[in-house]
Regions:
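P-loop NTP-binding core
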Residues: 1-263
Length: 263
């Protein structure tokens, strides 16, 4: 059964969409079956996967409000090799419409339940706020991957996010946990970045991924061509970093599965 991970941070511009697209493609490169869900009304993960958000017949919005089933909405990312549940501007209305629906915070979880056996990983790209859409992602998820820049104000925002994850786990999704913190746009030449990184390691320990994602021009260029960096420039530092992250994620899952088995 698929592990479902929400890629979330209430702060924008930290690399959520970049991580979602490139981690999905890198997991495919390790022969895993992957579904990427774009839950951000901007639809950047959709466009970055090579799917035109302006020509969609069905999207994640239609799925959430019950106007289509999953099979009618899913697209395929040719360059990424993963399946995609796309988003467009219609999703902006989802915030209001969902508030009026029964089981509003569980719509995504219920929609995914019948197809979790079809995938190894399901990754959800969340909007940069604790909205009804993000709440749906966190209720559907097994864990949260938090991309973040190593800067001063990021630590303050991280504390709020961790508190919100704990609250959702207590009230709506007992299995929800922080899967890992991912340092993005990382430049080890800057002393502030190293200081913040050390604080993260001290506070979060093994929850902090060993892999760091460097600042890399290829990572910035790839979305404009509608492809993951692995398809755009597989030898770039960005591509190699996300391959390393995929490997680290798979190893963690393997260890976690072994630890959960009865002796």
């Amino acid at each position: 059964m698929a592990k479902v991970f929400a890629i979330a941070n209430q702060k924008g511009g930290v690399g959520k969409t970049t991580t979602c697209i490139n981690l999905a493609a890198s997991l495919v490169a390790t022969k895993r079956r992957v579904l990427l869900i774009d839950l951000d009304p901007q639809g950047n993960a959709t466009m970055g996967s090579g799917v035109d958000k302006h020509t969609l017949e069905n999207s994640v919005y239609d799925l959430l409000i019950g106007e289509c089933d999953l099979a009618e909405a899913i697209q395929f990312s040719e360059h990424g090799g993963y399946q995609l549940l796309p988003a467009n501007r219609d999703l902006t209305a989802g915030e209001v419409v969902l508030l009026e629906m029964q089981m509003k915070e569980s719509r995504l979880r219920n929609a995914l339940a019948p197809i979790r056996e079809n995938y190894d990983y399901i990754l959800i790209d969340c909007p940069p706020s604790l909205s009804m859409l993000t709440l749906n992602a966190l209720v559907a998820a097994d864990g949260v991957i938090i991309p973040m820049q190593c800067e001063y104000f990021a630590l303050e925002g991280l504390s709020d996010l961790v508190d919100n994850i704990k609250r959702i786990a207590e009230l709506l999704n007992p299995q929800l946990k922080i899967e890992g913190l991912l340092r993005t746009m990382y430049d080890p030449r800057l002393s502030l970045i190293n200081d913040v990184s050390a604080q993260l390691k001290e506070h979060f320990g093994d929850q902090l991924y060993d892999t760091v994602i460097p600042r890399n021009i290829r990572l910035a260029e790839a979305p404009s061509f509608g492809m993951p960096v692995l398809a755009y420039d597989k030898t770039s530092r960005g591509a190699l970093a996300y391959l390393a992250l995929a490997g680290e994620l798979v190893r963690r899952q393997r260890r976690s599965s072994k630890a959960a088995q009865p002796t």
